[in-house]
């Protein structure tokens, strides 16, 4: 019995150390290559390149890649924000059914209002899934809208998941 308790204690301590900073420091984190949004002419509109952040295979860090948003101008509009959201969903970086209800920018602060499907998926994802979803969402929107904070709401209200309260603006997630 003591053997099992010792093993359990060792696992809990390892997990606690990992969560408290045993991961990569911001200085050690591999920086994503700088790829500002670009526009290329396309038949029927403008294609915009945007940077997406999504979980790596080990689900312990975020990986950055670029995606093309067809027929979209990079602007603070619900349509452009939804196009980015759909790219994140396609990379399993946001819950299916997530939709942008509203977006606004005031200086370097972005406000993003999402639907109940986003919150339901977030609550079902567990603590690691929640961290990856929120990190993907926040880092992607910070990068593409050149902001320092994102306030995320659901149906216009702050929300909680059981793991975290989301009632304040969020800054970039680092792991």
Q: Where are each of the predicted segments found?
A:
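Bimodal "functional hotspot" detector
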Residues: 2-13, 18-175
């Amino acid at each position: 019995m003591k053997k099992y308790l010792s093993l359990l204690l060792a696992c809990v301590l390892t997990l606690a150390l990992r969560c408290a900073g045993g991961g990569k420091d911001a200085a050690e984190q591999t920086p994503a290559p700088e790829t500002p949004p670009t526009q290329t002419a396309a038949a029927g509109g403008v294609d915009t390149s945007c940077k997406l952040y999504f979980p790596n295979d080990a689900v312990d860090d975020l990986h950055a890649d670029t995606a093309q948003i067809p027929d979209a101008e990079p602007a603070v509009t619900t349509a452009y924000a939804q196009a980015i959201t759909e790219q994140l969903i396609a990379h399993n970086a946001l819950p299916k059914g997530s939709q942008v209800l509203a977006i606004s920018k005031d200086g370097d602060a972005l406000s993003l209002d999402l639907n109940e499907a986003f919150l339901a998926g977030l609550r079902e994802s567990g603590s690691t899934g929640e961290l990856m979803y929120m990190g993907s969402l926040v880092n992607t929107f910070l990068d593409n809208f050149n902001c320092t904070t994102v306030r995320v709401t659901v149906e216009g209200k702050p929300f909680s998941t059981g793991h975290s309260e989301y009632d304040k603006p969020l800054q970039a997630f680092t792991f």
